[in-house]
Amino acid sequence: MRAVVQKVKKSSVKVDGKVVGQIGKGINALIGITEGDTLEDIEYLKNKILNLRIFEDEEGKLNKSLKDVNGELLVISQFTLYGDCRRGRRPSFIEALSGDKSEKIYNDFVDLCRKEVPNVQTGVFGAHMDVDIQNDGPVTLLIDSKKVF
């Protein structure tokens, strides 16, 4: 599993012009899933995202986690995180897991996050979405459960 994690002042996602998820201060997490992802990958990514110390403490240092600041989480599926751009000009998405398997893993990830964070919002799995993100910092991190980077 992969994630692009962005600390935000606010973020929202629309499908067909209708807001389906929105948060205030927190994290916008774009999530990609590949063949072979398991509960271990889900747990790793969940623990990393919810406990990353990317929020300021009283001294202005990045020393607090989403959970520490009672932040909100917006989770959006994004298969293009497994796009391979090394050859040619059109990305290949063969590493992205598609269909029901991917949706189940995504839903399992969201469910586990909801057990630890009071406000977890989502986009619509597999839909074309318009995402508005007001970065805070900006702080943007890439996480891979296989520790590729």
Curated annotation (Swiss-Prot):
Pfam families: Tyr_Deacylase (PF02580). Keywords: Cytoplasm, Hydrolase, RNA-binding, tRNA-binding. One of its GO terms (cellular component) is cytoplasm. The keyword Heme does not apply. Its main location: cytoplasm. It is found in: Cytoplasm. Belongs to the DTD family. Homodimer. This is D-aminoacyl-tRNA deacylase. The gene is dtd.
